[in-house]
Amino acid sequence: MQKKTLSDISLQGKRVLMRVDFNVPLDQDRNITDEKRIVEALPSIRKVIDNGGRLILMSHLGRPKGKVNPAFSLSPVAKRLSELLDCPVTMAGDCIGTEVMQQVLALQDGDVLMLENLRFHPEEEANDPDFARELASLGEIYVNDAFGTAHRAHASTEGITHFMQTAVAGYLIEKELRYLGTALNDAQRPFVAILGGAKISGKIDVLESLFEKVDTVLVGGAMVFTFFKAQGLDVGNSLVEENKLELAVSLLEKAKAKNVRLLLPEDVVVAGEISADAPSRVEPVSAISAGMIGLDIGPATIETYRKEILDAKTVLWNGPMGVFEIDQFARGTFAVAQALADATAEGAITIIGGGDSAAAIAKAGLSDKVTHVSTGGGASLEFLEGKELPGIAALND
């Protein structure tokens, strides 16, 4: 997907309307608890400022449900951004309207204006054309750098492009497309995908898409128990999607037909309940005790998976191996994170596909030891499923 980017256009003196993803977590006192998304937008923001553009930033934050709610104001973000850039960031009182337009027209080259939360207006998520047109009237150039919302056709990501001639990708989207696109279309082999998470149902399309591309799939997380039950094994009280047993069998057959090795755990960590102080033990998957719940991959599986990861040239990881929020069930997930870091050090391309895996690799302190951590959970999954992302399709080729 070759899209025009920030590097392809002249910015001097132009009003640049940039959609960023500043949907950051805030604590009770409205302090930002994780500023990763703000930091990741800085290269695109600095490019506009340094090239004398007049920057207007827009984002959503949380789910205010189409009503003005001060708890979801972007003002803490504007304040933090101003500190990171070491220059003033003016906070607008809304994202459309006469006052906002006056603030926009008063901007000088290199100035930054932050619009208020787009989702204070129900028209944003409804992709309302009048709202999109009003947003578009604020800028002369549109830049989308919000990969995390690229799979949604909203007014600020898709609708707006119908009213602006110049619509380009920011550096963050460019980087996402480069890494995820390379993984899917031009991967160095062996190509290993690691899929975790609780349910097969959320990963069917990804699995089927990956069967066309990868050499090996390593499966972890609670979804393994649906596969095990489908194979006739006892899984104790582990999570099983009873209505997906036939699907699990067909996925195993599909992998075989495509010559893809699909590896399931050989041992698991089990406990009687999901809690930090529940006594746990390792059991082979062929002998899971009645009443026990599988909550992580076991040491033998960790060893096997580690070896597969270290033999790979391209690795894609989406979804944890167990309940990593609880330390005693986090070993598998952190071992995978470490194996990815080690593979990267040996020259492999390693890509973390957003969501829980991104949180896990951050918790392991290894985010900067892999090639690429995707910023979009749902967006990276849909991209890996081979779906077209509306927010990206809408940009200039």
Swiss-Prot record:
Pathway: Carbohydrate degradation; glycolysis; pyruvate from D-glyceraldehyde 3-phosphate: step 2/5. One of its GO terms (biological process) is glycolytic process. GO terms for molecular function: ADP binding; ATP binding; phosphoglycerate kinase activity. Disulfide bonds: none annotated. Its main location: cytoplasm. One of its GO terms (cellular component) is cytosol. InterPro entries: Phosphoglycerate_kinase (IPR001576), Phosphoglycerate_kinase_CS (IPR015911), Phosphoglycerate_kinase_N (IPR015824), Phosphoglycerate_kinase_sf (IPR036043). It is an enzyme of class 2 (transferase). Substrate binds at residues 21-23, 37, 60-63, 119, 152. Its EC number is 2.7.2.3. It catalyses: (2R)-3-phosphoglycerate + ATP = (2R)-3-phospho-glyceroyl phosphate + ADP. ATP binds at residues 203, 294, 325, 354-357. Pfam families: PGK. It is found in: Cytoplasm. Keywords: ATP-binding, Cytoplasm, Glycolysis, Kinase, Nucleotide-binding, Transferase. Belongs to the phosphoglycerate kinase family. Monomer. PANTHER family: PHOSPHOGLYCERATE KINASE (PTHR11406), PHOSPHOGLYCERATE KINASE 1, CHLOROPLASTIC-RELATED (PTHR11406:SF23). This is Phosphoglycerate kinase. The lineage of its organism: Bacteria, Pseudomonadati, Chlorobiota, Chlorobiia, Chlorobiales.
